[in-house]
Amino acid sequence: MDLEKLKEETQIIIDDVLKQTEIKSGQVFVLGLSSSEVNGGLIGHASSAEIGQVIVSVIHKTLSDKGIYLAVQACEHLNRALLIEEELADKKDWEIVSVVPQLHAGGSGQVAAYQLFKSPVEVEHIVAQAGLDIGDTSIGMHVKHVQIPVRPISKELGGAHVTSLKSRPKLIGGERARYE
């Protein structure tokens, strides 16, 4: 796989998704990543540390530059736990759990984030305002209600299907209510 091309395509996708989701500084963005799918394989069966490193590095830098927190979802072997900065866990009072991600228990995205983050910790539950799913990893459980699908500029990254979610407040009150 051409890693330079992957880097460029990842940048195009994350820039587009951030524009469409309108996520703000201080908010949380969740990433689900199957490097196996990006690599043209079946999720969980062809993990690539190099692919994870490229994708997470681009997304982490882009979000950090905007003051947005990145949460990287693990695979099902870690119950889809999330790797985040300890600062965020403390700020949100999210319970920290003990595990160090590995390529086949957590995934390439978590391994890359573990190396990039200043003080990485794992938590089991978060509420993110938006997210990006590379390879059909099912990030919806981590995105705040009400979730709205976002169609990224590219539907694929390598061999992986790409989708995204944003959220909005619930509309309550029925026909008498007014909304912005």
UniProtKB/Swiss-Prot annotation:
Pfam families: DUF436. Coiled coil: none annotated. InterPro entries: Antibiotic_NAT-like (IPR028345), DUF436 (IPR006340). Signal peptide: none annotated. Disulfide bonds: none annotated. HAMAP family: UPF0340 (MF_00800). Belongs to the UPF0340 family. NCBIfam families: TIGR01440 family protein (TIGR01440). This is UPF0340 protein LACR_0494. It comes from Lactococcus lactis subsp. cremoris (strain SK11).
